[in-house]
């Protein structure tokens, strides 16, 4: 796509050209719902973009035409084996779907059993768009906004989508859109911000070599999340050394991206961003704290480098503001944290309406890479590369339609019904139902 800097080669693009490069997508994309009260047109001086975004939000995501008869949810179970979680849903007609839960359910499973389970029983799964809206109202669940409800809710949604896909003989990607990407090109995500430059580089080189990655994201800044020491700081000067060193080490053909996880002030974010621009990085993720929306916009205005955000964002209207006000150029909803693929697709389609692109944040562990792949397969405004944290998992399963291997930086998306994999019954049998 002309005008888009993928982190490879010279960067001549400014933000307006970046937005223009993705223009034209908006006319092709239908969309899903939020409550009518939440999308009602406001004052006359309201940003005119909101009317367009609100119209997009009113359109459904789930391709309901695949289902001519009700699919009534009869049972919804959360299963646990040690620190592993599965979700199993069954319809009155005997259809079944399964999902793999995020490790965060170790702390959040009571929200599944108390706040979500009662709501979904007896509902028609074909109404999934509306269910994902109204579940926030039930029991004042919106008070649990963010990962606390998003992660359990996504676990429910993934299982329902797996069931619906098996009923219709369609992949999850086909249920939430048209297939645009039968293969997903990935970038290797790395961490190591607390380590020295030398040690970080060796670990990053190891990670890149393991999957022969063609694209890479590094961490910059000194967000010391891994310690209780309130005085802890990262290695001095690490960012200033890492940014040019990574480019020099991997060359101009490697697409590079950077993530600060909200570490910087506006001034320091712009300073770091200028260095990223100099060394041709493709985007700058979370330059300031995710909920500093005005400050994020200030950083975006101070750089030509695209700003990416969304891992921590929990609100559809939060994304709505960021998009309408050009605070970001790339949306990154996390399919787990944000409450599933349908809500995430709403974000992607809002972004597409204004020439912005989407690359989801990927939660590691479980089968997070599979949920990422199905979501990306249906993205009309997908970025060229998508986050990848490896294929390692404790889940025992079989996939008949994809080798699930990284070849030339790409992974083939499974084409079987639902998630496209069958979880080993012997593995499932190790799990016990979690009771309320």
Identify what each model region corresponds to:
Residues 5-26:
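N-terminal secretory signal peptides and thylakoid transit peptides that target proteins
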Residues 32-79, 96:
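C-terminal segment of N-terminal export signals and the immediately downstream linker at the start
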Residues 50, 96-168:
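Metal- or metallocofactor-binding catalytic centers and their adjacent structured scaffolds
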Residues 85-93:
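Short beta-strand elements
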Residues 94, 156, 169, 259, ...:
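Conserved, mostly hydrophobic/aromatic
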Residues 118, 123, 130, 134, ...:
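Shared catalytic-loop signature of beta/alpha-barrel
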Residues 157-195:
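Glycine-rich, aromatic-flanked loop segments that form ligand/cofactor-binding clefts
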Residues 183-298:
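Metal-dependent enolase-superfamily TIM-barrel catalytic cores that perform enediolate-based chemistry
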């Amino acid at each position: 796509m002309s005008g888009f800097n993928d982190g490879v080669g010279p960067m001549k693009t400014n933000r307006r050209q970046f937005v223009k490069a993705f223009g034209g997508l908006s006319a092709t994309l239908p969309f899903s719902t939020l409550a009518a009260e939440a999308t009602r047109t406001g004052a006359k001086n309201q940003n005119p973009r909101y009317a367009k975004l609100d119209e997009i939000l009113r359109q459904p995501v789930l391709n309901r035409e695949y289902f001519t008869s009700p699919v009534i949810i009869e049972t919804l179970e959360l299963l646990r084996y040690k620190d592993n979680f599965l979700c199993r849903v069954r319809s009155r007609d005997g259809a079944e779907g399964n999902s793999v839960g995020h490790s965060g359910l170790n702390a959040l499973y009571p929200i599944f059993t108390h706040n979500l389970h009662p709501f979904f029983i007896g509902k028609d799964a074909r109404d999934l768009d509306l269910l994902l809206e109204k579940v926030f109202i039930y029991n004042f669940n919106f008070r649990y906004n963010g990962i606390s409800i998003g992660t359990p809710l996504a676990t429910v949604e993934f299982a329902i989508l797996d069931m619906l896909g098996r009923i219709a003989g369609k992949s999850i990607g086909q249920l939430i859109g048209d297939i645009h990407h039968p293969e997903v090109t990935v970038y290797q995500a790395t961490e190591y911000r607390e380590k020295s430059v030398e040690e970080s580089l060796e670990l990053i080189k190891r990670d890149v070599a393991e999957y022969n990655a063609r694209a890479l994201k590094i961490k910059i800044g000194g967000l010391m999340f891994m310690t209780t020491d309130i005085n802890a700081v990262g290695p001095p000067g690490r960012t200033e050394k890492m940014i040019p060193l990574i480019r020099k080490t991997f060359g101009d053909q490697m697409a590079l991206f950077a993530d600060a996880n909200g570490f910087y002030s506006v001034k320091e974010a712009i300073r770091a961003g200028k260095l990223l621009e100099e060394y041709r990085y493709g985007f700058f993720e979370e330059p300031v704290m995710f909920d500093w929306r005005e400050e994020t916009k200030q950083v975006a205005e101070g750089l030509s480098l695209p700003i990416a955000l969304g891992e921590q964002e929990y609100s559809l209207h939060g994304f709505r503001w960021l998009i309408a006000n050009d605070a970001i150029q790339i949306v990154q909803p996390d399919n787990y944290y944000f409450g599933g693929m349908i809500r995430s697709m709403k974000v992607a389609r809002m972004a597409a309406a204004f020439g912005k692109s989407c690359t989801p944040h990927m939660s590691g562990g479980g089968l997070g890479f599979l949920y990422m792949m199905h979501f990306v397969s249906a993205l009309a405004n997908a970025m060229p590369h998508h986050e990848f944290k490896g294929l390692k998992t404790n889940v025992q399963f079989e996939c008949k339609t994809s080798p699930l291997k990284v070849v030339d930086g790409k992974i083939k998306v499974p084409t079987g019904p639902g998630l496209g994999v069958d979880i080993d019954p012997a593995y499932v049998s190790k799990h016990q139902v979690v009771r309320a």
